[in-house]
Curated annotation (Swiss-Prot):
The gene is DIS3L2. Its cofactor is Mg(2+); Mn(2+). This is DIS3-like exonuclease 2. PANTHER family: DIS3-LIKE EXONUCLEASE 2, RIBONUCLEASE. It comes from Homo sapiens. Mg(2+) binds at D383, D392. Its EC number is 3.1.13.-. Residues 1-45, 860-885 are annotated as: Disordered. Specifically recognizes and binds polyuridylated RNAs via 3 RNA-binding regions (named U-zone 1, U-zone 2 and U-zone 3) that form an open funnel on one face of the catalytic domain, allowing RNA to navigate a path to the active site.
C-alpha cells in the first residue's frame, strides 16, 4: 500500500484553495544560474538527465528472466550519493552510485535495478571498510532480539508491549553525526565495524565527500578477486513509492538573482540529505520571504515532492506548511511524523460512527452465552503505572495436583472493529499506533484504546483467551483457546509486581498497592504473581536452552516537565523480573496461536518470520571478533546468545564490552516480517531466527497492531466463531507488507523522537558527562558508546586540545596515540592510547546548530564525578513487545 494523501489538504503557504502548484516552467531542469539554460536551442527537446523508466511489461519479463533485480532502496545518510539494495543471495549489497543512477527513487522505495557492465562495478580496495553499507541500514532489527523497551514518559509503547520485547532494533548508522567522512579504510579486512577508517579532516563539515576509497574498474576484471568487486546497478523502475515524498527543511533564495528561476522559485533544502533539493513556487512561500529571507532562516517547513521530470535535476514541490522554529519539540515532532507518513489527523466522523453510540456501553446479554465467563477468576494486568491502553491480562490458578491453570487474556478488539467498515479501513491503513516520547498517535479511536477495549480493573471486558494447564516447570499439559469475559481485579504496575517478586514472604502494605476488588485479596494476587514468576523463569530458561537469542541494548527513559513538556532528566531503563514475567507468557500465547491458525488455514495464516543474519555482514563480524581475540560463536542464534551471556564477567569493563559487542551483533540482523503462509513454499522460511521456533505470530497487542486484529479474526474462524477470513492469500500478503512498512516507520519515528528529546536535554541541561567505551578507531577520530545514555558518538581529534595524534596498527588492532597539550608550561604533555574497548570519559555538549551535540574526550587526569546519579524512578514504559518475537 502506498501512503495515503490525508495530509495533502494542508494548504500550500500563499496559495489560494483550488490553485495548483504542480505545473512547473519549461526551464526548471536547469540549475540556478545556469546561463546555458537561457540560451538553450529551441530546435529540439531538452536533454534528459534521468533515463526513462522501463515499461511494466519489460520489468515483469526482466524479473522473471533474472536480468533485473528488485529490492528496497537504502540511501546512505552520511553519503547521499551512495545507495544500495540487498543482494538476493545475501552477499554484498548491490551498489547504486549517484543521484542519476538512482533515477528519482527515494529512500525506502521498492525499486527494480539493472546491473551495469562489469567494467563499471565498484572496486573495493582491500583496505576499504565498506562502512557505507552498514551506515545505509536503518532501523531494521526486529524487536524480538532485544529485551529492553524504549521507555516513554507516561505511555505504554507499541514497542513496549510485552510480546515485542525481544524484537527491539539497533540503528547502526550513527544518524546524529552527519559529518562527511571521505575515506573508509579497513584494518586487515575488518569490514563494516568502524575498526579503522581513514578520514580527511573534519574542517569540511558537510561538504561533498570524495570517493577515493572506491573506483570504477579500469583494468582487466579478471585480475581482480571476486571479493574486491561490488556489483553496481542503476534504477530502471520504481515498483512502489514507499517514501512519503514529504520532507522537513528550510527555504532559501536561489543563488543567481538574475536568472528566470529566481523570479519564480525558491529552493527548499531538506534536513534529510537523502531527499533531493526541491524547487518551490514563490507563490507558496510567505509573502515577505523574498524581501526578508533571513527572517525564515530558522523556520521549519514541510514540503511535498509533486513531480520530478527526466530533464530536471531538482524535484518540483509544493510547500505544505510552516511548522515553527527548528529545534523546538513540537515542530520537529510534526516534521518527523510527516516525513515518515504517519497519519496523525483526527478520526473522521464516518470512522467515529462505527463506534458504539450509547454510552456507557455494556456487554450485550447474548455475548454471555457465546463466551466462557471468567469474571470470578483472579485476573489482573501488569503494565506501566500510567498506561491507559491495557490489552493483556494474566491469571494463574493452583490445581490440586500441583499444576497450574494459567491464562493469557487479550482485549477482543475485533468485536468492535467490523470487517470492511470505515473503522477497519483506517486501522488497516494506519496499521500501528506510533509512540513518541511525549504522546501517542493511536491506530484506533481513544474510546476503544482507553475505554471499551482496555482491560481496566473492576469492569466487565470482552477478551480472547489462551488457557493452559502447566506444570511448575512450564510443561504444557493442556491448551484451550476461546472467547471469554473477564473482570480484572486490579491494575498492577511493573513496580508493584517487582516488589511482590522481591518480597515473596512479606505482605505488601495495602497503601503500596492499587485498589483490589473485594472478591479477591492482596495475598491471592501476590501468590498468583509469585506462581507466574516461577513458571516464567522455567519457560525462559528452557527457551534459551532451546537456542533463543536476546540482544539487550541500552534504552533511554525520560522524565518530562509537566508544564513545559521539556525533558528534565533521563536514565537507562532497567528491564526487571516483572517485565520478563509478562514477556514469557505473551511469547507463549503468540506461539500457541501461530500453530493453531496455521493448522486450520495452512494457506492463509498470518505469521511472523525472522530471517537469519545477512551472510556478508555476519562473516565480517566473525572476522572482527577473531582479530580482537573475542571467543564468540556465531554458528546459531543459541550459540551467539551463549557466547554473550557466558563469555563476559560482571565487572564494569566486561559489562561495557558486552554492550559494545551486543551493538555490533545487532547490525547483521534482519527485520522480522509478517507474511501469509500460503505464499512461501519452503516451511524452513517460516522460522523465527531470534526465538528459534518454527512458527510465530502476533496476537497479544490488537489495540496497537492491526496484524493482531487479523490474527484474532483467523483464530475466531479456526474455532468456528465466524466464517473463514474473506482475504485471498495475495491480498493478505499485501496487508502484511503494509504492516511491515508501517511498523518500520513507527520504530524509526520512535527512535527519532528519543534522539530529539535527548538532544534537547543536552542543550537545556548539558554539558553531560559519562563513561564511554571505544567501538571503532579511525585515523583522525574514534567512535564511542556513551554508557550512561546509550548513544553512539564520534570524537574528532582536531576538536581536542592535542599537540599531536598518531594512528598505527599493533598487529591487526588499530590504535590512536593522543598527545595532549600541557595545561601549564611546567607539565609534560600527557599521552593517551586509544584502542578498541578502551574505557574513556566524555562530555556531551550542545552545538550552535539546532539539535546537534558533540562528544568531547576528557583530558587524562581530569576524570572525576561523572554527573548526576542515575535516577531511581522506574520507567513508565512497558517492555518492547516480546512479540518479537
Amino acid at each position: 500500500m502506498s501512503h495515503p494523501d490525508y495530509r495533502m489538504n494542508l494548504r500550500p503557504l500563499g496559495t489560494p484553495r483550488g490553485v495548483s502548484a504542480v505545473a512547473g516552467p519549461h526551464d526548471i531542469g536547469a540549475s540556478p544560474g545556469d546561463k546555458k539554460s537561457k540560451n538553450r536551442s529551441t530546435r529540439g527537446k531538452k536533454k534528459s538527465i534521468f533515463e526513462t523508466y522501463m515499461s511494466k511489461e519489460d520489468v515483469s519479463e526482466g524479473l522473471k528472466r533474472g536480468t533485473l533485480i528488485q529490492g528496497v532502496l537504502r540511501i546512505n545518510p552520511k553519503k547521499f550519493h551512495e545507495a544500495f539494495i540487498p543482494s538476493p543471495d545475501g552477499d554484498r549489497d548491490i551498489f547504486i552510485d549517484g543521484v542519476v543512477a538512482r533515477n528519482r527513487a527515494l529512500n525506502g522505495d521498492l525499486v527494480v535495478v539493472k546491473l551495469l557492465p562489469e567494467e563499471h562495478w565498484k572496486v573495493v580496495k582491500p583496505e576499504s571498510n565498506d562502512k557505507e553499507t552498514e551506515a545505509a541500514y536503518e532501523s531494521d532489527i526486529p524487536e524480538e532480539l532485544c529485551g529492553h523497551h524504549l521507555p516513554q514518559q507516561s505511555l505504554k509503547s507499541y514497542n513496549d508491549s510485552p510480546d515485542v520485547i525481544v524484537e527491539a532494533q539497533f540503528d547502526g548508522s550513527d544518524s546524529e553525526d552527519g559529518h562527511g567522512i571521505t575515506q573508509n579504510v579497513l584494518v586487515d579486512g575488518v569490514k563494516k565495524l568502524s575498526v579503522c577508517v581513514s578520514e580527511k579532516g573534519r574542517e569540511d563539515g558537510d561538504a561533498p565527500v570524495t570517493k577515493d576509497e572506491t573506483t570504477c574498474i579500469s583494468q582487466d576484471t579478471r585480475a581482480l578477486s571476486e571479493k574486491s568487486l561490488q556489483r553496481s546497478a542503476k534504477v530502471v523502475y520504481i515498483l512502489e513509492k514507499k517514501h512519503s515524498r514529504a520532507a522537513t527543511g528550510f527555504l532559501k533564495l536561489l543563488a543567481d538573482k538574475n536568472s528566470e528561476l529566481f523570479r519564480k522559485y525558491a529552493l527548499f533544502s531538506p534536513s534529510d540529505h537523502r531527499v533531493p533539493r526541491i524547487y518551490v513556487p514563490l507563490k507558496d512561500c510567505p509573502q515577505d520571504f523574498v524581501a526578508r529571507p533571513k527572517d525564515y532562516a530558522n523556520t521549519l517547513f514541510i514540503c511535498r515532492i509533486v513531480d520530478w521530470k527526466e530533464d530536471c535535476n531538482f524535484a518540483l514541490g509544493q510547500l505544505a506548511k510552516s511548522l515553527g522554529q527548528a529545534g523546538e519539540i513540537e515542530p520537529e515532532t510534526e516534521g518527523i511524523l510527516t516525513e515518515y507518513g504517519v497519519d496523525f489527523s483526527d478520526f473522521s466522523s464516518e470512522v467515529l460512527e462505527c463506534l458504539p453510540q450509547g454510552l456507557p456501553w455494556t456487554i450485550p446479554p447474548e455475548e454471555f452465552s457465546k463466551r466462557r465467563d471468567l469474571r470470578k477468576d483472579c485476573i489482573f494486568t501488569i503494565d506501566p503505572s500510567t498506561a491507559r491502553d491495557l490489552d493483556d491480562a494474566l491469571s494463574c490458578k493452583p490445581l490440586a495436583d500441583g499444576n497450574f491453570k494459567v491464562g493469557v487474556h487479550i482485549a477482543d478488539v475485533s468485536y468492535f472493529v467490523p470487517e470492511g467498515s470505515d473503522l477497519d479501513k483506517v486501522a488497516a491503513e494506519r496499521a500501528t499506533s506510533v509512540y513518541l516520547v511525549q504522546k501517542v498517535v493511536p491506530m484506533l479511536p481513544r474510546l476503544l484504546c482507553e475505554e471499551l477495549c482496555s482491560l481496566n480493573p473492576m469492569s466487565d471486558k470482552l477478551t480472547f483467551s489462551v488457557i493452559w494447564t502447566l506444570t511448575p516447570e512450564g510443561k504444557i499439559l493442556d491448551e484451550w483457546f476461546g472467547r471469554t469475559i473477564i473482570r480484572s481485579c486490579t491494575k498492577l504496575s511493573y513496580e508493584h509486581a517487582q516488589s511482590m517478586i522481591e518480597s515473596p514472604t512479606e505482605k505488601i502494605p495495602a497503601k503500596e498497592l492499587p485498589p483490589i476488588s473485594p472478591e479477591h485479596s492482596s495475598e491471592e494476587v501476590h501468590q498468583a504473581v509469585l506462581n507466574l514468576h516461577g513458571i516464567a523463569k522455567q519457560l525462559r530458561q528452557q527457551r534459551f536452552v532451546d537456542g533463543a537469542l536476546r540482544l539487550d541494548q541500552l534504552k533511554l527513559a525520560f522524565t518530562l516537565d509537566h508544564e513545559t513538556g521539556l525533558p528534565q532528566g533521563c536514565h537507562i531503563y532497567e528491564y526487571r523480573e516483572s517485565n520478563k514475567l509478562v514477556e514469557e507468557f505473551m511469547l507463549l500465547a503468540n506461539m500457541a496461536v501461530a500453530h493453531k491458525i496455521h493448522r486450520a488455514f495452512p494457506e492463509q495464516a498470518l505469521l511472523r518470520r525472522h530471517p537469519p543474519p545477512q551472510t556478508r555482514m555476519l562473516s565480517d563480524l566473525v572476522e572482527f571478533c577473531d582479530q580482537m581475540g573475542l571467543p564468540v560463536d556465531f554458528s546459531s542464534a543459541g550459540a551467539l546468545n551463549k557466547s554473550l551471556t557466558q563469555t563476559f564477567g560482571d565487572d564494569k569493563y566486561s559489562l561495557a564490552r558486552k554492550e559494545v559487542l551486543t551493538n555490533m551483533c545487532s547490525r547483521p540482523m534482519q527485520m522480522a516480517l509478517y507474511f501469509c503462509s500460503g505464499l512461501l513454499q519452503d516451511p524452513a522460511q517460516f522460522r523465527h531466527y531470534a526465538l528459534n521456533v518454527p512458527l510465530y505470530t502476533h496476537f497479544t497487542s490488537p489495540i496497537r497492531r492491526f496484524a493482531d486484529v487479523l490474527v484474532h479474526r483467523l483464530l475466531a474462524a479456526a474455532l468456528g466463531y465466524r466464517e473463514r477470513l474473506d482475504m485471498a492469500p495475495d491480498t493478505l500478503q499485501k496487508q502484511a507488507d503494509h504492516c511491515n512498512d508501517r511498523r518500520m516507520a513507527s520504530k524509526r519515528v520512535q527512535e527519532l523522537s528519543t534522539s530529539l528529546f535527548f538532544a534537547v536535554l543536552v542543550k537545556e541541561s548539558g554539558p553531560l558527562e559519562s563513561e564511554a567505551m571505544v567501538m571503532g578507531i579511525l585515523k583522525q577520530a574514534f567512535d564511542v558508546l556513551v554508557l550512561r545514555y546509550g548513544v553512539q558518538k564520534r570524537i574528532y581529534c582536531n576538536a581536542l586540545a592535542l599537540r599531536s595524534h598518531h594512528f598505527q596498527k599493533v598487529g591487526k588492532k588499530p590504535e590512536l596515540t593522543l598527545v595532549w597539550e600541557p595545561e601549564d608550561m611546567e607539565q609534560e604533555p600527557a599521552q593517551q592510547v586509544i584502542t578498541i574497548f578502551s574505557l574513556v570519559e566524555v562530555v556531551l555538549q550542545a552545538e550552535s546548530t539546532a539539535l546537534k551535540y558533540s562528544a568531547i574526550l576528557k583530558r587524562p587526569g581530569t576524570q572525576g564525578h561523572l554527573g548526576p546519579e542515575k535516577e531511581e524512578e522506574e520507567s513508565d514504559g512497558e517492555p518492547e513487545d516480546s512479540s518479537t518475537s
